[in-house]
Swiss-Prot record:
Stretches the record annotates as Disordered: 1-64, 79-98
Cross-referenced CDD domains: UBX_UBXN2
The gene coding this protein: PUX3
PANTHER family associated with the record: NSFL1 COFACTOR P47, UBX DOMAIN CONTAINING PROTEIN
Name this protein carries in UniProt: Plant UBX domain-containing protein 3
Organism field: Arabidopsis thaliana
Keywords: Ubl conjugation pathway
Residues annotated as domain UBX: 224-301
InterPro entries: NSFL1C_SEP_dom_sf (IPR036241), SEP_domain (IPR012989), Ubiquitin-like_domsf (IPR029071), UBX_dom (IPR001012)
Length: 302
């Protein structure tokens, strides 16, 4: 993360249940400070390329590890103010044309910021809409160490290195709510009662045909023991969502996730990785690792 910190304006919203900020940590170290505050404050650390918004809950902290993360983020330059996204330039952009008729190329467009939300619960933490992760899991040690250092974890780094990354840190007292399990309707091979059995080769062919028409989402199971990543999806209808995949999942799995979330919509769309210029994803069998899609932004285009 950039070492240049920007101080932002104080939020105007009142105190909300379950949220406490780093200003409360500061008050505990200042005995003369007034106990009545105007409401919650937020702290943002980062500069042109990265940012971190830090919040802390209203009750006394229960987990030393989480306290350490928030305290170190404050010590490494967290400043008061809400997270603000870099405003887009209002200057004219486009292709110019000289009086002689020659075209003048426009300047390179800066990529949009990639935003990730990390919530610390009483029983672990979540990244965006991903599953609950444990603080004492050795596989999460490197991730949490980066947060302590006010750095962007490697798994959240965007494909386009020019894109700024904003990591929002929040803390809640309650346990992470359980997500509803996905129900998948039965799919398989039927056999007519009393019908003649087919040959082994024909049976294998039928099984292959059924497997080919099954929804890609049925096989989309994220294995927490394998390398995984979060991908931000921007759909053609303006919806933005974050989905977690294993690195061995394919472009076709991403399409299956989109089509399951938007049943009935036409599937004659293309996917492309946000960048300049955008990179089309034309090979549905290509894995996320092969396509370099880890922590990327994928756009749906009709």
């Amino acid at each position: 993360m950039s070492s240049k910190d920007k101080k932002l304006s104080k939020p105007t919203s009142g105190r909300t249940g379950g949220i406490r900020t780093l200003s409360d940590l500061n008050r505990r170290s200042e005995p003369d400070s007034d106990s009545d505050s105007d409401g919650p404050q937020e702290y943002f650390t980062g500069g042109e390329k990265s940012g971190m918004l830090v919040q802390d809950p209203t009750k006394e902290p229960k987990h030393d590890d989480v306290d350490e993360i928030f305290n170190q983020a404050r010590q490494l330059g967290a400043v008061e103010g809400p997270l603000e996204h870099p405003s887009s330039s209002r200057s004219f952009t486009g292709t110019g044309r000289l009086l002689s008729g020659e075209s003048v190329p426009t300047a390179l467009q800066q990529p949009e910021p990639v935003i990730h939300n990390i919530i610390f619960w009483s029983n672990g933490f979540t990244v965006d809409d991903g599953p609950l992760r444990k603080l004492d899991d050795p596989e999460n040690a490197s991730f949490l160490d980066s947060i302590r250092k006010s750095e962007c974890p490697k798994e959240l780094e965007p494909v386009d290195k020019r894109a700024p990354v904003h990591v929002n840190l929040m803390r809640r007292d309650e346990k992470c709510p359980e997500k509803e399990k996905l129900k998948v309707s039965f799919q398989g091979v039927g056999r007519t009662l009393g019908g003649a059995s087919s040959s082994t080769a024909s049976s294998q062919s039928n099984l292959t045909d059924v497997a080919a028409v099954q929804s890609p989402l049925q096989s989309l199971v994220v294995d927490e023991t394998l390398p995984s990543t979060s991908i931000q999806l921007r759909l053609a209808d303006g919806t933005r969502m974050v989905a977690k995949f294993n690195n061995h999942h394919t472009v076709n799995d991403i399409r299956g996730f989109i089509e399951f979330s938007r049943p009935g919509n036409p599937n004659n769309y293309t996917l492309q990785v946000m960048g300049f210029p955008p990179k089309p994803l034309t090979d549905p069998s290509q894995t996320i690792e092969q396509a370099g899609l880890a922590s990327s932004v994928v756009i749906q285009k009709f």
